[in-house]
Design a protein with these regions (language model features):
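A short, hydrophobic beta-strand/beta-hairpin element that forms part of a small beta-sheet core
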Residues: 56-64
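A short, Lys/Arg-enriched interface patch at domain edges and termini
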Residues: 71, 77-78
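Cytochrome P450 catalytic domain signature, combining two hallmark sequence patches
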Residues: 81-85
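Thiol/disulfide oxidoreductase modules built on the thioredoxin-like
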Residues: 47-54
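Local sequence-structure signature of Cys/Sec-based thiol-disulfide redox active-site neighborhoods
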Residues: 1-30
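Thiol-based oxidoreductase modules, predominantly thioredoxin-like and allied folds used
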Residues: 31-43
């Protein structure tokens, strides 16, 4: 799958829910902009976009999506659409 420029994933390397999303992305060869919230200033950027500092957070065309299962379900839909199309 190609690089998805309309997506940004905010994550924390030690977060098990983030690891779940990252593992799925790697398994499906999904790439997008990645932002590590442990880097100074990145969590403030996340809060400015979504109103909270919860990770993982997938930004889709500027709109936040939280919860690892929801993010994986969304990404699965993209993979399925690519396989069909």
């Amino acid at each position: 799958m190609a690089y998805l420029s309309n997506l940004t994933l905010y994550y924390k390397p030690t977060c098990p829910y983030c690891q779940k999303v990252l593992a799925y992305m790697e398994e499906q060869d999904i790439a997008c902009e990645m932002k590590d919230v442990t880097i100074p200033g990145v969590v403030d950027e996340l809060v400015a976009i979504g109103g909270k500092n919860q990770v993982p957070c997938l930004i889709i065309d500027g709109q936040p999506m939280y919860e690892s299962d929801d993010i994986i379900m969304y990404l699965h839909g993209l993979v399925a659409a690519e396989e069909i199309g």
